[in-house]
Amino acid sequence: MLSLRALTSDDYQSWKRLWDGYLSFYKTELSDEITANTWRELNDSKSLITGFVAEIDSKVCGIAHCFLRPSTWHPVGYLYLEDLFVDPESRGAGVGRALLNKAAEYGREIGAERLYWITKGDNAQARVLYDSFVKGAATGFIQYEYLL
């Protein structure tokens, strides 16, 4: 059975396995220091970053990390879903959609005006989910990135 909950400090081993899978999927390497800092932030009640896990039959199979960012256009701000990853063995079981719904529910609870995220253009499987979740209402905006 699929269930969702807030990430806790007891989830480290499961989270780390999925986090490593997520980084591998995006062919990204981060230092141990950044990973440790991310974990610390996810477990700090004063942090802006919030984490959720999905479980199937008590096994953690998906993670989502999001944070509220201020906006000049809305008094509360927008909830940014920075990371979403589902164990490949659990894909197709509704885990990704459930995590999106959990993030949206959290955003409504804190008064955010919208939930938003990005994905790679070639992430076809995720894009099918995202397009159906937003009912085809992609923003049409193009993201630019300038490394500092």
Task: Describe each model-derived feature in a short phrase.
Residues 86, 92-105, 132:
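Conserved acetyl-CoA-binding loop-helix of GNAT-fold acetyltransferases
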Residues 70-81, 91, 138-139:
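A conserved beta-turn-beta hairpin within the catalytic core of GNAT-like acetyltransferases
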Residues 30-49:
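Active-site rim helix/loop that mediates acceptor-substrate recognition in acyltransferases
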